[in-house]
Amino acid sequence: MRVLGIETSCDETGIAIYDDKKGLLANQLYSQVKLHADYGGVVPELASRDHVRKTVPLIQAALKEAGLTASDIDAVAYTAGPGLVGALLVGATVGRSLAFAWNVPAIPVHHMEGHLLAPMLEDNPPEFPFVALLVSGGHTQLISVTGIGQYELLGESIDDAAGEAFDKTAKLLGLDYPGGPMLSKMASQGTAGRFVFPRPMTDRPGLDFSFSGLKTFAANTIRSNGDDEQTRADIARAFEDAVVDTLMIKCKRALESTGFKRLVMAGGVSANRTLRAKLAEMMQKRRGEVFYARPEFCTDNGAMIAYAGMVRFKAGVTADLGVTVRPRWPLAELPAA
């Protein structure tokens, strides 16, 4: 069985084809980073228009890459939410239209479930149960996962997501969009310990996060210490260390409260090398395992949507003739498979 996956929730157009026996057959991705760079962030209207231009050509490229034709596709999966409403509607409309034209099922996919299941695409996929850390520009959540659709929210950010805090702090440091990866690169040249940032909400019980205060702390630190290159690198290092330590502390608490031995990390920020190293070290000490997707599957992509669509289709999930998206869509509302 082969599923075509379409991802258009924000500023990446991702198309992939997944075969339940052969694995990933094609993966095409177009990033709009250059389009939005001059604005310092994603402009929803521009994102939607660019998805309109790129989605169909990328589908054609994916079919060519896989050596397939439309008649070889058994189902079409598309991101139905959460995300930017206009961007979601592009992918949903194309996906639903193709499914109708090809006379195959259409499968609406939850964007964050796609991220959560992305490590399943690797050679050594995690087994249930596990604690999942979903960490991206729009979400920071800890979730107890005991099966497909069996998700319990343990904690989440009460303000900025970790990825959003990275991007905002990068902007304060004068870095271009997207700032998160550039801040991490700058942090690698920084001196540890010159500046010490707080670890928000780690001095109290619970698994919720708060990252907005770190941005304010960074702004005050920059204002008080000048902006020579080394100082900026040292501030970037202090900021990254604070975010990574906070995530690690909360993950440890979540593992202790659930008793699970496996940790899955997913979402754009999961590509951060410092975070990966710290969590791997923590799990080694706990005699547990940590799992994550390869870097290209940490950010938005069609492969995770094709795979999640395959899983959901086998569980009996399909869409009706309507084109419906949900810009806000709690993961806990998904049915168990």
Swiss-Prot record:
This is tRNA N6-adenosine threonylcarbamoyltransferase. It comes from Salmonella paratyphi B (strain ATCC BAA-1250 / SPB7). One of its GO terms (biological process) is tRNA threonylcarbamoyladenosine modification. It is an enzyme of class 2 (transferase). The gene is tsaD. Its EC number is 2.3.1.234. Belongs to the KAE1 / TsaD family. Its cofactor is Fe(2+). Substrate binds at L134, V135, S136, G137, G138, D167, G180, N272. GO terms for molecular function: iron ion binding; N(6)-L-threonylcarbamoyladenine synthase activity. NCBIfam families: gcp_kae1, T6A_TsaD_YgjD. Gene3D superfamilies: 3.30.420.40. It is found in: Cytoplasm.
